[in-house]
Structures are given as structure tokens and as C-alpha cells.
Amino acid sequence: MRIISGKLKGKKIFFSKSTTTRPLKDSVKESIFNILTHSKLLNISLDNSNILDLYSGFGSFGLECISRGAQKITFVEKNEIIAKILKKNLLTLGIKNGITLVVDDIKKFLSRDLFEKY
């Protein structure tokens, strides 16, 4: 698993095969970003954006967003073991600023008053 585009292009993302969490395949990720960045209907730019990555897993989607210019990412992952691997990915890639890693149930997280706009 790797980062497809942007300033971190080609960098590897750690993941564990021994968990039930499945990483987002590169081909699927590439299709998602092609739709997001090239659709005239959506008109989305990741530059300086604030992204909420729910069910983050190993961070593949959020890390791709950072690589493509997102300014802030909030990762939400329930599984503490998976969250540790995500944190390792952030440290290995040298990503420190604009990152929030929340280890919590998604429904609980979304039921809170969110002060950020995503």
C-alpha cells in the first residue's frame, strides 16, 4: 500500500494483515480521488481543506489527502491497535501539523458537538 500522488507520492503505508481491518486498495483510492478532483459537478479542491476521515483504519485515505494538499485531517478509528499503526504511519512520514487522531467509536464521535467544519 502506498501514497499515489502529491508531495508524499510513492511512500509506503504500513498495515497489518493479522487484523480484520482491510486497507483501502490503491486502485479504489485512485478512483475516488479522480472523481473528487476531476468531476465538474463536485468542484472540489483539497488545497488547504479540512478532512474528516471516519473509519480511518491505517490512514490511507487521510494520508493521501495530506499528500494532495489538505491542511487539517481528523482521523477517527475505534480499534486501538489499528490506531497505533496509523500513528506509526504519521511518524514515519514526518506528518505532525494539522493532525488529530481520535480513538473512539464513530457514532459517539459524531454525537458530540463538533466545532470543526469538514
Show where each model-derived region lies.
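Conserved SAM-binding motif I beta-strand of class I
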Residues: 72-77
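S-adenosyl-L-methionine
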Residues: 1-63, 68, 84-117
